[in-house]
Amino acid sequence: MIEVLTTFHKAGWEQYGKRMVETFLQHWPEDVCIHLYCENVQTGIKNPRVIEHDIFETCPHIKGYLEQNNNDHNNGIRNGKRDFKYDAIKFCYKVFAQCHRINHSEADTLLFIDADTVTFATPPIEQLQELLPDDNFTAYIGRPNNNKLPFAETGFIMYNLRHPNIKNFSEVFEDLYTTGKVFDLEYQVDCFTYDTARRTVEQTHGAKSNDITGPEGLGKRHPFVNTILGTFMDHLKGDDRKAKGKSNVDDFKDRIKKDRLTQDYWK
């Protein structure tokens, strides 16, 4: 059984989250449900496949973390400008939600998907499941050979909830925040803390994970849509894509663009 989770605040729900959930319900199989971890918003959706959580009630550690650490510096402000790589506040909601779901889900496979995504075709479930072999505890979108963004793209993550080390991972991941260790890292963005926790579990337990982009990666511009995910889903990363309502054809690598342009969504 597969389960999905996402997170958003009130403005995010109105700008892109509602569309994400509506297109999820339209295209994903009927036996796949989605858990919404909501920050100060109620969606009003009445559908048995949609389970809504107040993130502050469901993830009790988040309040203390925010009360202790929510300041300009920890929001990534450097020299008067925000640098997302050092933002330990905005992205912490994703982390606490993922750790809660890992520990409380009864599914076999858990997918974290960013709320600024759109599903435009039926997901190939069997092919998706092949991205996460039984002996791997997580699968992710890597950015190998990217010196500017030397960490995973965490708009999509898969978790094998039947793996013996998956709860070791959630413990390490959440511990980075509850202990303040996140502030000792080179970067505080969740992409880097995910990589840190993943590598810790790999090194400590000999566990395996899968970079779905392969050893050479899938470019620096927009690896999400260049994976198999781009055949049924779009990730509206950044203000420009959100304003346009979709990603750009130029986001595709040349060898992938031709196939994508056969789909109505990308034309």
Descriptions of predicted regions:
Residues 161-266:
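Catalytic core and acceptor-binding pocket of nucleotide-sugar-dependent glycosyltransferases
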Residues 94, 113, 152-155, 190:
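Residues that flank catalytic or metal-binding motifs in active/ligand-binding sites
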Residues 120-187:
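Conserved catalytic core of nucleotide-sugar-dependent glycosyltransferases
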Residues 1-80, 103-107, 161, 236-241, ...:
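N-terminal anchoring/stem segment of glycosyltransferases
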Residues 15-18, 92-96, 188-196:
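A structural signal for well-ordered alpha-helical segments within the folded catalytic domains
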Residues 86-88:
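Extracytoplasmic beta-rich repeat domains
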Residues 97, 156-158, 233:
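Conserved hydrophobic/aromatic beta-strand scaffold that supports enzyme active sites
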Residues 90-141:
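GT-A fold catalytic core of metal-dependent nucleotide-sugar glycosyltransferases
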